[in-house]
Amino acid sequence: MAIKKSELYSSLWASCDELRGGMDASQYKDYVLTMLFVKYISDKYKNDPFGAITVPQGATFDDMVALIGNPEIGDKINKEILNPIKEANKLNEFPDFNDETKLGKGKDLVDTVSNLVRIFNDDALDFSANSAEGDDILGDAYEYLMRHFATESGKSKGQFYTPAEVSRVLAKVIGISPKNATNQTTAYDLTCGSGSLLLKVANESGKDITLSGQEKETTTANLARMNMILHNSPTAEIVADNTLTRPAYKE
């Protein structure tokens, strides 16, 4: 049975409400999307040695659930779950789940992080049971949240999200299509944000093209990398660095 988008969105916004008091949208988006990412890759790949992403033993969402109520839950999520996932998949830094300035101190932090895990510990959000293997429900949810986070934070969507309509038009403007794209075709975005434009170009190509991007903000670059994985483009290369002073791609 496929997961209903309404159920997924409801859970995501419940997690936003849990975090909303201590930080603004530009900050809590990282926690929500990280939790979504860990839940998704755990359900999809934890028992798949040939999966698109490696989920180390002891670093699954189930291991997060086992930490609910633990006085050291924030520190343990950082060290025992997120760090192993980061190292195994060459990701950038995840948000700090033990940050007292954002999540509260002592029992407040434990309760906030525990409740965040509980929200995603829902049978309705079992991604391993999603019958539509090719359905982009996670990618759609990711972009849905990006749009709303931009609105909530009062910042331009362009900071970390290119609207789907704009991405689609730009992908068509450059003229890429199944007729002229091959498996040797490459696409590069020098200010890729969350990677939405790259993904639209890949979609327009109709082929397994090579995707590359560079993004100055480390957190946003990590969101782009996660976005690539959620959209079945795990081989995309995203560099976190300043394009103007240290361009990673010069050819």
Question: For the regions a protein language model found, what residue spans apply to each?
Answer:
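Non-catalytic, mostly N-terminal accessory regions of nucleic-acid modification and defense proteins
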Residues: 1-178, 239-248
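Conserved S-adenosyl-L-methionine
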Residues: 156-251
